[in-house]
């Protein structure tokens, strides 16, 4: 999802920087700037976490590097952060957006004034439902021979 988000934001004129385990040729070809995590966190106004489930990237030090007056989006299935460090960061002038409690990490944070959580998976589109249904039917047909 990170690549699609970057492409959409670029369309609207955003300067795109990213962090990954390694620099991506396709991203470089689009003019996206690969940065070390600490530099990306310090320089970006908006940060989108698009990580695999149970991948925690943001701890106390990373939130310190982010500083204040930031917007954090999480499109993952689980939190991209250590909960205690995240809760402390939320007390600053920051905002967090996510789609589900699973992505937020704690039901206790739902009513936090700096959290916006829809509690509905943004990946649950009609097209995704149709694709999943077709996949299940194909698997059943293959299993039954």
Give residue ranges: language-model regions.
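Conserved beta-strand scaffold positions in the cores of enzyme catalytic domains, especially
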Residues: 16, 34, 72, 114-117
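Glycine-rich adenosine-cofactor-binding loop
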Residues: 1-13
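P-loop/Walker A phosphate-binding loop and immediately adjacent motor/lid segment at beta-alpha junctions
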Residues: 8, 17, 61-71, 142-143
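NAD(P)-binding Rossmann-fold cofactor-contacting core
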Residues: 11-29
């Amino acid at each position: 999802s990170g690549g699609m988000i970057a492409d959409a934001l670029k369309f609207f004129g955003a300067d795109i920087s990213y962090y990954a385990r390694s620099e991506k040729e396709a991203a470089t070809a689009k003019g996206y700037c690969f940065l070390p995590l600490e530099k990306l966190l310090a320089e970006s106004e908006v940060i989108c976490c698009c990580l695999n489930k149970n991948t925690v990237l943001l701890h106390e030090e990373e939130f310190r590097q982010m500083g204040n007056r930031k917007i954090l989006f999480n499109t993952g299935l689980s939190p991209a952060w250590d909960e205690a460090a995240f809760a402390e960061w939320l007390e600053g002038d920051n905002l967090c957006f996510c789609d589900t409690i699973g992505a937020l990490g704690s039901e206790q944070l739902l009513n936090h004034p700096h959290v916006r959580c829809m509690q509905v998976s943004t990946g649950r589109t009609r097209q995704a439902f149709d694709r999943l249904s077709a996949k299940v039917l194909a698997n059943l047909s293959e299993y039954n021979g």
